[in-house]
Structures are given as C-alpha cells and as structure tokens.
C-alpha cells in the first residue's frame, strides 16, 4: 500500500480513492510477497493466528496461510479484497479476507499472535499515526508481534508514501510495546513504477501489555 497512486501527487485519503487504485495494478502490488516476509515465514516467525493489515490483493496473507497459519486479511478497498479472495481460491488456500479500516481494527473483535504490515504504517500522517498504533494495540495479543515494512528516509525523492525514520518508529511504539529490531530492508515495487526497489525499514515490535 502506498500513499499516492501512479502518476498522482495527491495523497489517497478516502476508501473510494483506495478502491479506485485497484482498477489497475498499483505499484506496490508485485504479485508476490515481499522478500522480508518470505524470510520471516521461513524462519518460523509467522505462525498461529495472523492478521495481514492493509492486505491489498493478499500476497502476505497467502504466504502465512501456506505456512500453516490461521489468517485474516483486511483492506479498505473492496476491489483488493475481491482480488485476494479469487487468488486464494485459485491457489487452494484458506484465508478470511474482509473489507476493513486499519484505524478501526478493534471492530474485528479478536486478537492475533502476529500482525503483518507491508506498507501501511507509512501512509498515515502525524494525526493518524497514533490512532493506527492504538488500533494495532487492540488486535495484537500481549506477547504477540507486529512486523512492519515501510519506506525509510534513505529513499530519495518524494514520490509515493512519506519516509519514516528509525527514531519515528521507536517513538510511535514507546508505550506498551517493545521494539525488538529495526533493520534496513528493501521494499519491492512492481515493474514500471517510478522507483525501483526502495530503501525501507523492517521492524519487529512486541506487544508488552
């Protein structure tokens, strides 16, 4: 998920705008899971009850399901959810995909062992970022882990989502969370996007209470 659609300088703000992006192929929809999540799954880090927040067309969610997890994927865009359901059916994978708002995850009414975030954190402005963290707190069980991939400040230019610093990540999760790692990573984009693979942060953050 990115903050700006292809060829646009205006941030996406509404559910309708997010949905409109999926009339085509958005630049973050590569048709495969991001490599950092593949490595995490292979290392046994995606197990139990898993939520893929801002799941798009479901690649991270289906990766988790293929590794035996019980998976829910939520996205604000109905077209993305429709595509995700079709892909999961084609691949013979059981994933529950629902239209939902990342700022209101409490509406799911359940908690998860693992929450995956591929490009959601970085779409929020300063006002909505604390709301998103509070929303996450409602669904990550105590001791559970939230894994996120976001653009870093090392990515040049201003195309796409806002850049995030390590200090911003640590500050956002200072209360009620334990930052276990923040590592440089790569965020892959689809062919033809204005940027190639971009510099990113990959973080693992545990819910401490």
Locate each region found by the language model.
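Class I (Rossmann-like) S-adenosyl-L-methionine-dependent methyltransferase catalytic domain
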Residues: 2-51, 57-108, 124-139, 144-209
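A short acidic, Gly/Pro-enriched loop at the edge of an enzyme's catalytic core
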Residues: 107-115
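Short catalytic micro-motifs in class I SAM-dependent methyltransferases
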Residues: 119-123
């Amino acid at each position: 998920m990115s903050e700006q659609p292809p060829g646009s300088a205006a941030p996406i703000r509404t559910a309708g705008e997010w949905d409109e992006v999926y009339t085509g192929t958005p630049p973050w929809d590569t048709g495969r899971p991001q490599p950092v999540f593949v490595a995490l799954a292979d290392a046994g880090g995606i197990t139990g009850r898993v939520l893929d927040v801002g799941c798009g067309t479901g690649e991270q969610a289906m990766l988790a399901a293929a590794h035996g997890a019980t998976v829910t994927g939520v996205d604000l865009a109905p077209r993305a959810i429709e595509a995700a359901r079709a892909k999961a059916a084609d691949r013979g994978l059981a994933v529950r995909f629902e239209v939902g708002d990342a700022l209101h995850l409490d509406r799911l009414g359940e908690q998860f062992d693992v929450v995956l975030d591929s490009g959601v954190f970085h779409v929020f402005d300063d006002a909505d970022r604390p709301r998103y963290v509070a929303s996450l707190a409602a669904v990550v069980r105590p001791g559970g882990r939230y894994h996120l991939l976001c653009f870093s400040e090392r990515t040049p230019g201003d195309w796409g989502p806002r850049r995030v610093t390590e200090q911003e990540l640590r500050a956002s999760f200072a209360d009620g969370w334990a930052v276990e790692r923040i590592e440089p990573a790569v965020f892959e984009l689809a062919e033809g996007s204005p940027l190639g693979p971009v510099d990113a942060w990959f973080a693992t953050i545990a819910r401490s209470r």
